[in-house]
Amino acid sequence: MINDLKKDSEQRMLKTLESLEQGFAKVRTGRAHPSILNGVMVPYYGSDVPLNQVANVGVEDSRTLIVQPFERTMVAAIDKAIRESDLGLNPITADSIRVPLPALTEETRRDMQKIARSEAENAKVAIRNIRRDVLGDIKALLKEKEISEDDERRAGDDIQKITDKYVAEVDKRLAAKEAELMRV
């Protein structure tokens, strides 16, 4: 039973790390990466759909993305959606859409660093909340006399070690992202 709680907490913490990576993908580093446009929604026959469902997004060079719509009629809508996104990008439209990424200024780098730190802090909070939930479940098992106090103490220590491991991983990934951001 305790092992199930440990496995469950590890899986939930792993999902938090995956979510952190998705959050980091939205932070521009100055290099072109298709995931920068993941959050862009395009109007398509009356409903908004993710850009990657109406076009291929690729990297042309280190500072340019290329968006190739599946239908030529979508070029204007995709162009407009990219311009209106909060990414600060100005696409160049022809048969396909080229999206040059502006060079990051020092101020922009600092802003992106703040966003990355915020994402990391949110991940740490989520991990700690998972720990709190699992420790609550363990205490409930103790109250129901399903486990002994020694088992509760050991399980609590194990959960803390798992939590520390994942918090350290978040810090490691944040440090890597910050280093990537500050690289000119």
UniProtKB/Swiss-Prot annotation:
Annotated CDD domains = RRF
Location comes to:
Cytoplasm
Q: Which domain of life is it from?
A: Bacteria
Q: Name one Pfam family in it.
A: RRF
Matching entries from InterPro entries are given as:
Ribosome_recyc_fac, Ribosome_recyc_fac_dom, RRF_sf
Q: Which UniProt keywords apply?
A: Cytoplasm, Protein biosynthesis
A single GO BP: cytoplasmic translational termination
Q: What is its main location?
A: cytoplasm
Q: Which Gene3D superfamilies match?
A: 3.30.1360.40, Ribosome-recycling factor
Which cellular component terms (GO) are annotated to the entry? cytosol
GO MF term set: ribosomal large subunit binding
> Which family, according to UniProt?
Belongs to the RRF family.
Task performed by this protein:
Responsible for the release of ribosomes from messenger RNA at the termination of protein biosynthesis. May increase the efficiency of translation by recycling ribosomes from one round of translation to another.
Q: What is this protein called?
A: Ribosome-recycling factor
Q: Which organism is it from?
A: Acinetobacter baumannii (strain SDF)
